[in-house]
């Protein structure tokens, strides 16, 4: 979505995105960041796969920040978000600053999407609605990332955000 790399697989199919990809992304300020797209969060994995996924997810611990991409059209959006938060806490990444990208916004009418965004903002979450298919919300997400990094650097007193 952010790297605009058309070779990346995006399918609504179980285990379609098992590989981790890293891409450089230029933000509106000119700053370049490295984004890592990891495996998604899957509930009720067979026990044999849990260890393999955990190893991949534990790499998240070294991240300066997280962009959590959620399917805005999913009927169980808040349950999925809860699973993500629980998993992040379990692997020691619960305190890493994060932004939410509510993808597939093109599949929702404006009112339900606004309700979701308002609910998340009211709970203190930084969120932006996006559509990878239409490209909508991507400039706003990049602006939010830029502002977020500036705020994080100012708060930490550092020029670079590192873990």
Give the ranges of each region predicted by the language model:
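Short, contiguous acidic/charged loop-to-helix segments that flank catalytic cores in large enzymes
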Residues: 44-47, 71-76, 129-133
């Amino acid at each position: 979505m952010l790297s605009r790399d058309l070779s990346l697989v995006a399918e609504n199919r179980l285990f379609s995105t098992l590989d981790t990809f890293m891409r450089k992304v230029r933000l509106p300020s000119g700053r370049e960041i490295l984004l890592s797209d990891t495996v998604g969060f899957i509930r009720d994995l067979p026990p044999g796969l849990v260890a393999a996924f955990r190893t991949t997810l534990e790499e998240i611990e070294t991240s300066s920040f997280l962009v959590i991409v959620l399917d805005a059209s999913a009927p169980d959006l808040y349950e999925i978000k809860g699973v993500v938060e629980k998993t992040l806490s379990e692997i020691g990444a619960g305190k890493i600053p994060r932004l939410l990208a509510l993808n597939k916004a093109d599949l929702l009418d404006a009112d339900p999407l606004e309700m979701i965004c308002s609910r998340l903002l009211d709970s203190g979450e930084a969120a932006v609605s996006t559509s990878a298919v239409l490209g909508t919300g991507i400039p706003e997400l990049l602006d939010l990332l830029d502002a977020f990094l500036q705020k994080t650097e100012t708060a930490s007193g550092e020029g670079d955000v590192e873990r």
